[in-house]
A protein has these predicted regions:
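Bacterial N-terminal signal peptides that target proteins for export
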Residues: 2-12
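C-terminal motif of bacterial Sec signal peptides marking the signal peptidase cleavage site
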Residues: 22-23
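Core hydrophobic alpha-helical transmembrane segments of single-pass membrane proteins
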Residues: 12-19
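Glycan-processing catalytic domains of CAZymes
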Residues: 29-321
Length: 321
């Protein structure tokens, strides 16, 4: 999936995505559809391509039971079909390299399904922070593996997300000690060097990355005990900084339904209220204050499709009071 769908399909995408929010499962998905569609009518030509962050670890010990396995091809086919029905054109998948065999296998199966359904996938590479002395080599080796197995070779490679012909790789930092300049130099030797995108704007990394993406965050006020900080100031700062200071960098906006990690084994008791569906609707619309038909936002990332452990999943709809 690339810029070929940027104007027509992405306009349809945002239009179909603004529908989610009620009480039972069917009406919750209908509201999700409505929310996504209401957004599209405002600027029919420069809509961003809509993606969703995807977690591939369900069915593996250590994660909650959500009723399915991320390695079940039937589940993956259903998820792709449902995402497309909402106007989502691709999944950005948490990936740790081949050392995490369950997630790597799930990603491989998902890319196979995507390739047969005109759907895109991309890697969200989680930086390895377990062994600080080897994070740079790990990143280079893992990304080379991704290139050889998912981006450059095989029948499913056509499903890998591209922008202006180049593969897109998202990087999720974990406070490691990765030398991203070395990583950049390594991937630049590929026949088709990727676009590397880093979470949040970091002026120190402007020379090593092609752009930055937003991620769920409460904003300057931090995590409020009552969940009232829904991320408005964070998104305003991200879009303002990208348009004013880094207009030549690739920007990926974000939207989310809320956040609640109290079910996760690693919980830090962080809460962002769904505000009866307003958090998703407001975060989904906010980019329009900074982007338009003349200066379109390339991508909008929904955080997330199915992270039930952090309370950001839209797969089954978003709740309405």
């Amino acid at each position: 999936m690339n810029s070929r769908i940027f104007h027509l399909a992405s306009a349809l995408a945002l239009s179909s995505i603004l529908l989610v929010v009620v009480g039972c499962a069917g009406s919750r998905r209908a509201d999700l559809h409505q929310t996504l569609r209401q957004n599209e009518a405002r600027t029919p030509n420069g809509e961003p391509e809509v993606l969703a962050a995807y977690q591939p670890w369900f069915g593996r010990p250590g994660h909650i039971n959500v009723g399915y396995s991320s390695q079940d091809p039937a589940v993956l086919a259903r998820q792709v079909a449902e995402a497309k029905d909402l106007g989502i054109s691709g999944f950005v998948v948490n990936w740790y390299g081949p050392s995490h065999a369950f997630e790597d296998r799930a990603y491989s199966l998902l890319q196979d399904v995507a390739a047969g359904n005109d759907f895109a996938v991309a890697i969200l590479y989680d930086e390895n922070s377990d062994d600080p002395g080897h994070t740079t080599d790990d990143a280079i080796n893992d990304l080379n593996y991704a290139h050889d197995h998912y981006i450059a070779a095989g029948a499913s490679a056509r499903a890998y997300l591209r922008y202006n012909g180049r593969p897109v790789i998202f990087i999720f930092p974990k406070d490691g000690h990765t030398d991203w300049q070395r990583v950049r130099q390594a991937v630049n030797t590929w026949p088709d060097p990727p676009l590397l995108l880093y979470k949040d704007v970091d002026p120190r990394l402007v020379g090593d990355f092609d752009g930055f993406y937003a991620w769920v965050h409460p904003g300057r006020g931090g995590w409020a005990a009552d969940g009232s900080n829904w991320g408005q100031s964070y998104l305003e700062h991200f879009y303002s900084e990208m348009t004013s200071q880094y207009p030549d960098k690739l920007a990926v906006g974000a939207a989310w339904p809320g956040f609640d990690d109290r079910r996760a084994s690693w919980s830090r008791n962080r809460l962002m209220s769904a505000r009866c569906g307003k958090t998703f609707a407001d975060s989904l619309h906010l980019f329009r204050r900074y982007y338009n038909d003349q200066r379109p936002l390339p991508f909008l990332l929904i955080v997330t499709w199915n992270d039930y452990e952090e309370g950001t999943a839209i797969e089954r709809g978003t709740g309405k009071c």
